[in-house]
């Protein structure tokens, strides 16, 4: 049976001609032309504003970050609709891929009202974060905004609160990376601060709660935006920034580098990279000379980065917060294709001592690795904590306790290598067996004790040495001190005692370091350290 065409009063006067499809209908054609014009005008406007400052547009940044032709934009015309009054908002949101892995990304558009955040922009970011939580995919935020839309008042501030809420919900569940590519001021700074990693360009980015004008008006202090909250300040002084990039290309490239070591969520494993016999042979050969890097004297410095590079896959170590608290080193590397977190004391800077900044840096990194299932390999060469009133008044007790909490609560595989020395409380907190590490090793001659031999002898034999000095002179006292140091070293601080009580699992030759770490990680790969159910809601970390 056939149905006759509708005629009469109910029929539309605009009925398309017979044979017309949705692909070439008048509505579709008009839509294509309208959207093409709006998008072209918006991008031309954005390019004119951003390129003049040496900056990319919001969409150019997304295209540079993601794999080619993978970006799916969501909510492009939220707030305006796609009709004749269509216009872009101050943020671009959507999904794409990085090295074939799905991610969520938002990019603030400074060419639209200075990238200011209002109801529309906040709704788009919140929706993206909610989607990322459901999909269990990483979130990357490209920040370039003048702040909240003042004309929206508390409505704009509310959106910041909603974003903070979702960011906290995602913390430890999916990796979150913020890239500061322009201004980020006021309450907006807390959004990136809540994420796992903050990357900032050296020249264009600024972060501060109160800007130079407010500082000048309230305190009289004259300070530039760069000196107050530039990337270099946050990368080396405050520790807010984890990587200071030379330019936008470097910043976006670092996002891809970080993600290469991370799982898409805490529920899946990190990527596993191909690793063949040729790779193994080359890395084993490089690792044989690691002992030649480290001087036998505990008083001589060396670069621990060279030590780590000698034993990890392909010599590749990606440092995090390289310029902040340089007396310790943290970063990512691989062993036989498996990503791990690396922690190490740096004897080149303050002899590798621990201080307030180093403690913050170590604790946060270890907790991040634990949240996302990355084993932690710790290289120890530490004389203790940095002494002085400055450190005590800055809270070394409270902040140092964070490192203890991070290691003690970690459930991922923990492998520790003591290279030369580990003294006092610093030994305990740096991934010791007593604090919860799984496997601990040391090199021959490593000194593990409450104090170094010289300091211990000076305390234990203070009266005896004073008597020798009074009766026989300074030269005799010096000789006696050296004899007692050698005696104390042989009796107390050699590795044998640590091995005997189980604090050290084995003394290993330096050239065996890589193979021991590889074997240890393989043995611990199936580690299931789920803690028993507890009536407590969560621990009270000494924040």
Regions of interest found by a model, annotated:
Residues 2-543:
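Ligand-binding clefts of soluble mixed alpha/beta catalytic domains
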